[in-house]
Amino acid sequence: LQAARRLGAAEDDFSWPLQRALMTYVEENWMRPDNGIWEIRGPQRHFTHSRVMVWAAFDCAIRAVREFGLEGPAERWQEIRDEIRDEIEQRGWDAERGTYTQYFGSEGVDASLLQLPQVGYLAPDDPRMVSTVEAIERELLHDGLLLRYRTDTGVDGLPAGEHPFLACSFWLVEQYASSGRMDDARVLMDRLVSFTNDVGLLSEEYDVAGDRQVGNVPQAL
């Protein structure tokens, strides 16, 4: 909805009421743990990516009021947005390792952290994002492509050895490009495009050793 407004799309009778209804739910439930973007098995946790997404929900609602003149409790939403950000910085940031973590209290990283700049949580070249990308590269790059997270940590009960998840590598391309690493972005983008099948589609994962697509086809994340 926010993207549509910025492109000049007109509000209809349902767009803002729908967003207000969604904000009511988010306001009442944002502090609850969940299973994260990857629907990880096991106990629910406070995933950093999930917290950033609710931060983004409040940020978009605030902007809808202040930039587009819609009616809503922007000051209250701003207080909650700031509270969420404080929690992320206190519990989702590992100062010793210099990286945001997969979930609060975790020592691992997650490729979904690459979406933090995409929703405006911080700039792509922010020092915290740059060091988080470095941690992601160290821990999740496998044959030059990104894993979602390390399954060998036992966080979800899956066996080690998951193939790289292609959408995550495209997120890395965007991060490289938006933070000024254009050469790295071009190299990785060209490699990813080379994996497309005869009708130009990509699967969920890629088996580098077997040089084949694996998982759900097409990938539509």
PLM feature spans:
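The feature captures the catalytic groove of carbohydrate-active enzymes
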Residues: L1-I88, D110-Q115, R212-Q213
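Alpha-helical support elements that line or immediately flank enzyme active sites
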Residues: L1-D13, P17-L18, L113-L122, F170-D184, ...
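Residue-level signal for cytosolic alpha-helical hairpin/rod architecture
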Residues: D59, S169-F170
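Extended glycan-interaction surfaces of carbohydrate-active proteins
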Residues: A21-G36, D82-L166, V187-L221
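Extended amphipathic alpha-helical segments enriched in small hydrophobics
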Residues: R45-F68, P164, Q175-L192, L221
